[in-house]
């Protein structure tokens, strides 16, 4: 089983027991986090796409670590002006281990079966 979730303006393809690094999330080590913005859910040859999200689906994870990314240097120089500026930035990151994927009541097979439209009946006179 896999799911595509959206968090921090990015999309992540996850499955159970995956470890992902996302933008900083509130919480301490060991806290549970839930991602409700599931874009796609699937597995075993079947998948469900959201429009834009799948209703009731969620992915649950556990915070492994709060850390900071590598230092990125921003250097600007104006030639012949004896002017320069050097700044550094480190992004706050959260390491999350995915513990479970929930389809939200409907499995991909059930969702595909329910999306089929019944044949139109003859109008009554």
UniProtKB/Swiss-Prot annotation:
GO molecular function: rRNA binding; structural constituent of ribosome
NCBIfam families: L21 (TIGR00061)
Classification via SUPFAM superfamilies: L21p-like
GO BP terms, alphabetized: translation
Job of this protein: This protein binds to 23S rRNA in the presence of protein L20.
Quaternary assembly: Part of the 50S ribosomal subunit. Contacts protein L20.
One cellular component (GO) term of this entry: cytoplasm
Compositional bias (Low complexity): 106-125
Organism this protein belongs to: Methylocella silvestris (strain DSM 15510 / CIP 108128 / LMG 27833 / NCIMB 13906 / BL2)
Record-linked HAMAP family: Ribosomal_bL21
Alphabetized UniProt keyword annotations: Ribonucleoprotein, Ribosomal protein, RNA-binding, rRNA-binding
Family: Belongs to the bacterial ribosomal protein bL21 family.
Basic residues composition bias: residue spans: 75-89
Protein's UniProt name: Large ribosomal subunit protein bL21
Region (Disordered): 75-94, 103-125
InterPro entries documented for this protein: bL21-like (IPR028909), bL21-like_sf (IPR036164), Ribosomal_bL21 (IPR001787)
């Amino acid at each position: 089983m896999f799911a595509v979730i959206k968090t921090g303006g990015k999309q992540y393809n996850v499955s159970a027991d995956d470890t992902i690094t996302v933008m900083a999330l509130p919480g301490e080590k060991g806290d549970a986090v839930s991602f409700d913005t599931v874009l796609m859910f699937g597995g075993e040859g079947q998948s469900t796409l959201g429009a834009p999200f799948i209703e009731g689906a969620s992915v649950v994870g556990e915070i492994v670590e709060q850390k900071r990314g590598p230092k990125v240097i921003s250097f600007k120089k104006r030639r012949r002006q004896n002017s320069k500026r050097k700044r550094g930035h480190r992004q706050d990151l959260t390491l999350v281990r995915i513990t479970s994927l929930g389809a939200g009541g409907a499995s991909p097979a059930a969702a595909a079966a329910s999306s089929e439209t019944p044949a139109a009946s003859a109008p009554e006179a």
